[in-house]
Regions:
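Enzymes and membrane/adaptor proteins characterized by extended Gly/Ser/Thr/Asp/Glu-rich
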Residues: 41-161
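Preference for extracellular/luminal or secreted protein segments
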Residues: 1-56, 162-163
Length: 163
């Protein structure tokens, strides 16, 4: 048995009780659904209806949508979930990775070009604030990537280090 009071969880007794009660109340299908993270391209109600009637995923990822739609999507997902879901987004360049009104801060290479480590911290705070405002709690984008293939047009601007 996993000790939920120990590292890395450090849960309080009431939180451990919630975990045990929630897990005991889940069907095998609901437990299996927790393994899935579904991509929602447009965050439209019909997408949720289909996915949650069949799969009941433990997480999802939004593509860039207007703020109001992202908030409505988060509320929709939470209302259908027994377990608080993981809601992911690509935030490597800013809050614009989840909502159309989000701030484009810059690629990690641009942040590194400032030669100011504090800029990476400021970027992370801006990304976290904008993403969490619409319910995201999981970033699917590295702040640091290592560019081992200079021909790769994606990782080269997401990288701080070229080797």
């Amino acid at each position: 048995m996993i000790d939920l009071a120990a590292k890395p969880f450090y849960l309080k007794p009431e939180d451990i009780e919630w975990v045990n009660t929630t897990l005991a109340g889940m069907t095998t299908e609901e437990k299996a659904g927790q393994l899935f993270c579904v991509l929602f391209k447009e965050c439209k109600p019909e997408e949720f209806e289909y996915v949650f009637n069949i799969l009941k995923p433990g997480g999802c990822m939004y593509r860039v949508v207007p703020t109001e739609r992202a908030i409505a999507a988060t509320q929709n997902i939470y209302s259908r979930s027994k377990v608080p879901p993981l809601i992911a987004a690509n935030l490597e360049k800013g809050g614009n990775g989840i909502v159309t009104e989000g701030t484009l801060v810059g690629a990690p290479m641009e942040i590194a070009a400032t030669d100011d480590i504090g800029m990476a911290t400021k970027m992370a705070h801006a990304c976290a604030a904008e993403a969490s405002a619409v319910g995201a709690n999981w970033a699917f984008a590295p702040i640091i990537d290592i560019d081992t293939n200079y021909r790769n047009p994606i990782t080269n601007t997401l990288s701080l280090i070229h080797i």
